Amino acid sequence: MVSKSKMNFIISLQKKKVREEERLYLIEGDKLVKEFLAAKMPVRILAARPEFLNSLPLVHKQGVREVIPASYDDLKKISSLKTPHNALAVIEMPDIKMDTDNLRKELSVVLDCVQDPGNLGTIIRAAAWFGIRNIYCSENCVDVYNPKVIQSSMGAVIHVNVFYTDLRKLLESAFSAKIRIYGALVNGDSIYSHKLDNTGIILLGNESKGISEELLPYITDKIMIPKISRATSGIDSLNVSMAASVIFSEFTRSKGRQL
């Protein structure tokens, strides 16, 4: 049974301020929890149905600081979801230092004011799929540890580093170092004909406003995904997470041609 004080603590982690103060975040779902346990992520609390706990290998439970058998009603009270899963865990945030030297060595992603949790989670998932290790977010992007981001990333936060920083300073430094900065813009060149490198920065903007005016001068390569459909209404753009997946895929395809 989950005590009332423990319930209140777990529920409080749905708030960004508390997550930042405690350096903890929530994950939910049988598959997600098992994946984090298998990856030996630092689990502070595991609250789960007894049958779920019994299904876990002993080695997966040994690294958990506190294991709490929970009823369905317990999980329903502490879950951020309408329908709770069999397991929920509180995870310690990693302490990863931002190393901008990586911008010279590999392909990185920069996100300007992406505010929808589902979009950020999907972008992280796509980045992990295509081998992109680092994402740099503006400080007004949605929090990577928002429960909805974690859910939509499907555990990909394990494999991708997400940093929050001043994008103008970051891009100014990259521009001065002659690092190519690919900005996704409506007036860009088709990504299918534009020459793409194995390294550089992919810059993606806000869902409705696009890339901020102050960042436009640092773009070295304007790219876009051409519309193939002849439909004249109803489809005027791709959302940022869909666009990100297409762009990541094309960079990977281009890289394959260069190997």
Residue positions per predicted region:
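Active-site/ligand-binding-proximal alpha/beta "capping" segment
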Residues: 183-236
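RNA substrate-binding interface of SAM-dependent RNA methyltransferases
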Residues: 38, 96, 100-187
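Structured adenosyl-cofactor binding patch, chiefly the S-adenosyl-L-methionine
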Residues: 129-130, 144, 149-155, 217-259
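Amphipathic alpha-helical repeat scaffolds
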Residues: 29, 115-123, 235-243
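Boundary-proximal intrinsically disordered activation/regulatory segments immediately upstream
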Residues: 1-53, 141-142
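Glycine/small-residue-rich loop that forms an oxyanion/phosphate-binding "nest" at active or ligand-binding sites
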Residues: 67-92
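Short beta->alpha connector loops at strand-helix junctions that form conserved
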Residues: 70-71, 112, 138-139, 161, ...
